[in-house]
Swiss-Prot record:
Keyword Magnesium: yes
Protein name: Potassium-transporting ATPase ATP-binding subunit
EC number: 7.2.2.6
Subcellular location as annotated: Cell inner membrane
UniProt similarity note: Belongs to the cation transport ATPase (P-type) (TC 3.A.3) family. Type IA subfamily.
Species for this entry: Escherichia coli (strain ATCC 8739 / DSM 1576 / NBRC 3972 / NCIMB 8545 / WDCM 00012 / Crooks)
Length: 682
């Protein structure tokens, strides 16, 4: 389930972003972006020069200087607008979460049990460890763990999913989130956080970006941009004495225009917007990342640990075959298996009934009309079945049925052992059926591998990402399913300790590991993984250990998370390539215009045949500003993502954004120059 997507240029967001762009013109805000701070200083300097020229205090073309100054200010505003628009989209998404915080009062229990005396207190006064009672119609006032009761809970305000979920004490479904609503029954909840520390509070603060910290890659790129800016600043500063020595000193306005066009203003103006938009796209997929670092790490992941059930397989095993023991016909086995499953409401039990009906036209029979007694499955017996008159039919795991047969004085056939082993090798789970002490045969329960999953794993493999299936199945079954699904490796009979050891092993090899989890036993592995996506339906411990929370609680989402992370890194790299390639065309526009009077040989570089020095310089400055606006949609939506190898992706991006970065400015600057000339603006 995805949240409602905002239009790229929502009118209300655009208006608000324009206001914020003007507010960001203050020096304190500009200082955070060194590249744009240089442009801001240049704008201020050229404005002062324009005023001085207009008043007669300085010689020069005041109109040209004012035009350059105006477009430099527009460049700064466009960069501010890109960042403000990205932040505005994130804040708009956060407002949907803010609307959840409506509860005003809570019933705080004096004792941790249902029926204890309750005091009505403001919800924002609840502390960690307090016990509260919530009943049908109430909004849960805090994050916590259910310690008593069970209820249907509407979590649509947070997840966007309209179907209610069950929350109950014990197990992995005891965690509740403040702001969700109880639909039926009641819950006694122990608060797990203090005011201001709830899941909603943390998520709102993160989404709004108030505390957004730069990621390592973002910092590294910023350092590169600063270095390039310093190099171009020094180069530009040395040009003035050269031109002055030649007898025709270049004006400060032209030098500022040259500097601004040469430094990487395009990526400098869009860098913050790309980071904010990456987290916003993650929320659009109903995944909340606790930091931009987590989103970035998702783009660098090269090992995926995937749970078999629900991620690789559909999660519900289906009966696929009846394999009779020696001397037993298949219909007899199917009849007994169906009888043993008549009152079994599990998906596996229903599939056995359906398979018997399909194969042998065996109709369901009413357990009550048969005067039969149903024997439910228990963790101790690991069997279920039915007693009809003198018939005692059971189905269950191999070990459980073996003990049952031997306890009733029977013998477990060797040929059935072989059939069990054969079923396991094929990736299915064997269930053995017995009547009295006579083993009738084996039911093969097959895990259904999700359609298209093998192709997705093949795409991940092309990208250099290794997939590892995690399962509690035995090695034979795990190996068969792994082969069918097309994963690169598997961990069978997985325990929390084994998962943690596997993650550490891959990290010791220098790999970045991503995984999903929902239980308390997953918390150590989630805390160790580089990208850890906790299920919203999971325990509080799992959500605290992870650095992302999937509001849909869909383990398959991990693959989408990696795609979004890679798209953000690709967007940043592609726009950096485009920005630096841009400088070449601007060099051919401004250098001849600025210095041809001193060094006529430079006219050979005027390959665009621009109308005049003034029009050439102004055209380059205008293009430099407009390209930021044209690239805002790309920064917010991300570049087109295709699962390719690293080398193929590099070649593709160099062709599109490297060559494009060279050609687009030549065309753009020439078109602007023609328009300025036709309109007699220079």
């Amino acid at each position: 389930m995805s949240r409602k997507q905002l239009a790229l240029f929502e009118p209300t967001l655009v208006v608000q972003a324009l206001k914020e762009a003007v507010k960001k013109l203050n020096p304190q805000a500009q200082w955070r972006n060194p590249v744009m701070f240089i442009v801001w200083i240049g704008s201020l300097l050229t404005t002062c020069i324009s005023i001085a020229m207009a008043s007669g205090a300085m010689p020069g073309n005041a109109l040209f200087s004012a035009a350059i100054s105006g477009w430099l200010w527009i460049t700064v505003l466009f960069a501010n607008f890109a960042e403000a628009l990205a932040e505005g989209r994130s804040k708009a998404q956060a407002n949907s979460l803010k609307g959840v915080k409506k509860t005003a009062f809570a019933r705080k229990l004096r004792e941790p049990k249902y029926g204890a005396v309750a005091d009505k207190v403001p919800a924002d006064q609840l502390r960690k460890g307090d016990i509260v009672l919530v009943e049908a119609g109430d909004i849960i006032p805090c994050d916590g763990e259910v310690i008593e009761g069970g209820a249907s809970v509407d979590e649509s305000a947070i997840t966007g999913e309209s179907a209610p979920v069950i929350r109950e004490s014990g197990g992995d479904f005891a965690s509740v989130t403040g702001g969700t609503r109880i639909l039926s029954d009641w819950l006694v909840i122990e608060c797990s956080v203090n005011p201001g520390e709830t899941f909603l509070d943390r998520m709102i603060a993160m989404v709004e970006g108030a505390q957004r910290r730069k990621t390592p890659n973002e910092i590294a790129l910023t350092i590169l941009l600063i270095a390039l800016t310093i190099v171009f600043l020094l180069a530009t500063a040395t040009l003035w004495p050269f031109s002055a020595w030649g007898g025709n000193a270049v004006s400060v306005t032209v030098l500022v225009a040259l500097l601004v066009c040469l430094i990487p203003t395009t990526i400098g103006g869009l860098l913050s917007a790309i980071g904010v938009a990456g987290m916003s796209r993650m929320l659009g997929a109903n995944v909340i990342a606790t930091s931009g670092r987590a989103v970035e790490a998702a783009g660098d992941v090269d090992v995926l640990l995937l749970d078999k059930t629900g991620t690789i397989t559909l999660g519900n095993r289906q009966a696929s075959e009846f394999i009779p023991a020696q001397g037993v016909d298949e219909k007899t086995l199917a009849d007994a298996a169906q009888l043993a499953s008549l009152a079994d409401e599990t998906p596996e039990g229903r599939s056995i009934v359906i398979l018997a009906k399909q194969r042998f036209n065996l109709r369901e029979r009413d357990v009550q009309s048969l005067h039969a007694t149903f024997v439910p499955f228990t963790a101790q017996s690991r069997m279920s079945g039915i007693n009809i008159d003198n018939r005692m039919i059971r189905k269950g795991s191999v070990d459980a049925i073996r003990r049952h047969v031997e306890a009733n004085g029977g013998h477990f056939p060797t040929d059935v052992d072989q059939k069990v082993d054969q079923v396991a090798r094929q990736g299915a789970t064997p269930l053995v059926v017995v009547e009295g002490s006579r083993v009738l045969g084996v039911i093969a329960l097959k895990d259904i591998v999700k359609g298209g999953i093998k192709e997705r794993f093949a795409q991940l493999r092309k990208m250099g990402i290794k997939t590892v299936m995690i399962t509690g199945d035995n090695r034979l079954t795990a190996a068969a399913i792994a082969a069918e699904a097309g994963v690169d490796d598997f961990l069978a009979e997985a325990t929390p300790e084994a998962k943690l050891a596997l993650i550490r092993q891959y990290q010791a090899e220098g790999r970045l590991v991503a995984m999903t989890g929902d239980g308390t036993n997953d918390a150590p592995a989630l805390a160790q993984a580089d990208v850890a996506v906790a299920m919203n339906s999971g325990t509080q411990a799992a959500k605290e250990a992870g650095n992302m929370v999937d509001l849909d609680s869909n383990p398959t989402k991990l693959i989408e998370v990696v795609h979004i992370g890679k798209q953000m890194l690709m967007t940043r790299g592609s726009l950096t390539t485009f920005s630096i390639a841009n400088d070449v065309a601007k060099y051919f526009a401004i250098i001849p215009a600025a210095f041809a009077a001193t060094y006529p040989q430079l006219n050979a570089l005027n390959i665009m045949c621009l109308h005049s020095p003034d029009s050439a310089i102004l055209s380059a400055v205008i293009f430099n500003a407009l390209i930021i606006v044209f690239l805002i949609p790309l920064a917010l939506k991300g570049v087109s993502y295709k699962p390719l190898t690293a080398s193929a992706m590099l070649r593709r991006n160099l062709w599109i954004y490297g060559l494009g970065g060279l050609l687009v400015p030549f065309i753009g600057i020439k078109v602007i120059d023609l328009l300025l000339t036709v309109c007699s603006l220079v």
